[in-house]
Amino acid sequence: MKKNLFYFLLAALCTVSFTACSSDDNGDGENGGFTELEHIWSLEPTVMYDESGNVTTNPDDAVKYTGSVQVTWDCPEGTSLEWGEGENKMQLPVATIKQLVENMGNANLASVLKSVEFKSNGQIVAVYKDAATTSTANDGWKTASDYATYKKVNNNQILVFLNTAKVTEGMEADEKAALTEVLKIFKDGIPVNIRWSANNTKAYFYIDKAFVTSLLDNQTLKAMLDSLANTDAETNSTVIMIKAIVNSAKDVMNKTTKFEAGLELMQ
């Protein structure tokens, strides 16, 4: 199996853990028609802190980053996620995962994502760069449209629908086939929760525990992994690893009392 397939399968677990939330909605809703949402949304400023907890402007001194990427993960102290298999198996404490996600996300996201616009016709448009850069120049930014649309469920939730053909455009055949299978998991839309600030100029787009739990029990994902299990030795090893991560994650989520992960954006 191509190594990229492993990353696609793993990304199926990780990506939605930070881009969607749970819902029993059947996909009904209105395209656009969400005045509060129909704006261009930008990232929160990134703030760096040193070991003493003081704000710093020197990345070499930074040990903590805050900004748009925000995670709440409440579970018993010492709860860990198992990663890897055999001699390579290791325990990653939930507290460490939370801090890593926030630090890495807030340190790097602003260099590849400038803004997200929710248009009145239901289109989602992002301004992005292909690769991270430390340059503050305005060059290099691109506009991505037709990759996703949204429907309003209520004032605190939207459904996001991915355009599979556009997302997989230009990929090698095996990579395209693999990612297409992964995206079938989200064919009914990705429900995204929204928590508004008092004046609606900030919005926190997040997932919760219920969705992560439902994803880990997703029958399409299970069937896909089972179908790949005996393809060849490398594939089988990868499938075993992913199943182990899924099983460990189920145990962790059973112990979790509150989980929210997402992006806080501002007008």
Task: Name each model-derived stretch.
Residues 1, 5-9, 30-33, 211-212, ...:
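Terminal low-complexity, poorly structured segments
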